[in-house]
């Protein structure tokens, strides 16, 4: 037997905290057990502890090739029964954030003709035996601008067709939440929609960035009202993304107070640095970041930082069962770039099929995100899978230079501890048949 290659360790108050990134498991052992395993003295470990270590993937048999097993998982994901359809109902937006990379198109929306094309495309997907669910992700622009008039009727029409096939649709919405009004919430509840809602920090900072003539007193309170209205109305799920820079964390206590009463299973916090900013050289941002993470965990909020998590792909957009369809019928393969002719990869036709630009499609299809030497060596590979295909297309052979670990603003020991505490809180909220092991 041998230690899993994908073990990470950090000291903790009870001994050594183990994190296996392959199986996404955690354990705490005493220091003596840790030393015995590092020296290969498995016969000196108690049978109970050894069984727990093996059962959770921290120790594997000598002939196990974990990397090869991972690669098999990577390619299996491409045959999933879920199809991910990102729909851009509009590239217009009712706020203008200085950091937004998109080129907004005022007044753009889904015409009746384009709605028919999307419906036929969804029909064609649902007619396939290997597709059981279409996951609609509404993106933009601001996808809620014409929701009641155009988007909701289209989704219900597709949902009704899916029912005739004993299939289903799921709906998630990436929104600034300023268009979520009380009359729309019952529609969202009927669709069981989930959300990513973005704020730019505390009230004053958010209002200085997300400005709208319609909301003269600012949009922050509008967003907070929408969060409460949604979570009070139905069993919604909200990923509250907080965009931050070097000043944001100094004033975030007010945000904590504003969401303190939200049911914990209905909300998760995600921290994302504004991509045009960099951490300060004196590491004060990392200190504030760590303190905020710990404060949120103490209050039993689930939280994510950096795009690591056990999955079988680098980016959802990399999967074969994925497409991005714009309001005008143009088709893309990435939501992290502006929706222009440069990045367009196809067009939706009247019969509900896609005419692809085959040279672009084939170039993307040949890329594996996991096989850069730096990624092969990395113990976080099962949680990352390397740069996404879009970045590899733009920056070939740059995986090590562009590794997300280079942007991590807390230490690896702090990161492992945060992940453990976050998992503990998740299991406390939702329950789990395999509790965290303390040995």
Residue locations for each model-derived region?
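N-terminal pre-triad scaffold of radical SAM enzymes
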Residues: 75-101, 119, 123, 128-137, ...
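Local cysteine-cluster metal-coordination motifs and their immediate loop/turn environment
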Residues: 92-102, 371-391
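Flexible glycine/acidic-rich beta-alpha junction loops that bind and position SAM and/or redox cofactors
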Residues: 204-209, 267-286, 308-315, 338-345
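N-terminal [4Fe-4S]-dependent radical SAM core
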Residues: 3-28, 47-86, 129, 438-439
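Short, small/polar residue-rich loop motifs at catalytic or cofactor-binding pockets
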Residues: 316-320
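Short Fe-S-cluster ligation motifs
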Residues: 121-141, 401-439
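Radical SAM/AdoMet-radical enzyme domain recognition
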Residues: 119-137, 146-273
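C-terminal accessory region of radical SAM enzymes
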Residues: 284-310, 336-385
């Amino acid at each position: 037997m041998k230690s899993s290659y994908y073990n990470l360790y950090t000291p903790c108050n009870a001994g050594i905290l183990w994190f296996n990134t392959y199986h996404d498991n955690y354990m705490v052992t005493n220091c003596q057990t840790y030393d015995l395993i590092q020296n290969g003295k498995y016969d000196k470990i108690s049978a109970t502890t050894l069984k727990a270590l093996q059962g959770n993937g921290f120790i594997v048999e000598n002939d196990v090739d974990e990397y090869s097993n991972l690669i098999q998982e990577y390619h299996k994901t491409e045959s999933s029964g879920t199809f991910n359809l990102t729909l851009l109902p509009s590239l217009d937006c009712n706020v203008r954030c200085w950091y937004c990379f998109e080129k907004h198109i005022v007044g753009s929306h889904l015409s009746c003709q384009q709605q028919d094309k999307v419906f036929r495309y969804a029909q064609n997907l649902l007619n396939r035996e290997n597709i059981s669910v279409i996951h609609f992700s509404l993106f933009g622009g601001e996808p809620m601008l014409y929701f009641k008039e155009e988007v909701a009727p289209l989704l219900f029409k597709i949902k009704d067709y899916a029912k005739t096939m004993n299939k289903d649709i799921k709906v998630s919405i990436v929104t600034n939440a300023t268009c979520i009004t009380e009359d729309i919430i019952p529609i969202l509840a009927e669709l069981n929609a989930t959300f990513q809602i973005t704020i730019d920090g505390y009230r004053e900072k958010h209002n200085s960035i997300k400005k709208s003539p319609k909301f003269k007193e600012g949009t922050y309170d509008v967003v907070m009202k929408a969060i409460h209205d949604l979570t009070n109305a139905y069993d919604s799920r909200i990923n509250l993304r907080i965009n931050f820079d070097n000043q944001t964390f100094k004033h975030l206590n007010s945000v904590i107070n504003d969401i303190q009463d939200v049911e914990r299973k209905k909300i998760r916090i995600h921290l994302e640095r504004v991509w045009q900013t960099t951490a300060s050289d004196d590491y004060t941002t990392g200190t504030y970041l760590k303190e905020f993470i710990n404060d949120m965990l103490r209050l039993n909020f689930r939280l994510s930082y950096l795009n690591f998590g056990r999955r079988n792909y680098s980016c959802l957009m990399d999967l074969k069962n994925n497409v991005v369809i714009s309001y005008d019928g143009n088709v893309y393969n990435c939501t992290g770039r502006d929706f222009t002719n440069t990045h367009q990869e196809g067009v939706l036709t009247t019969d509900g099929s896609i005419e692809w630009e085959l040279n672009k499609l084939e170039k993307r299809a040949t890329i594996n995100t996991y096989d850069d030497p730096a990624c092969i060596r990395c113990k976080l590979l099962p949680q990352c899978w390397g740069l996404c295909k879009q970045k590899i297309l733009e920056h070939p052979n740059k995986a090590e230079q562009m590794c997300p670990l280079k942007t991590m603003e807390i230490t690896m020991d702090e990161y492992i501890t945060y992940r453990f505490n976050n998992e503990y809180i998740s299991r406390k909220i939702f329950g789990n048949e395999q509790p965290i092991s303390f040995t």
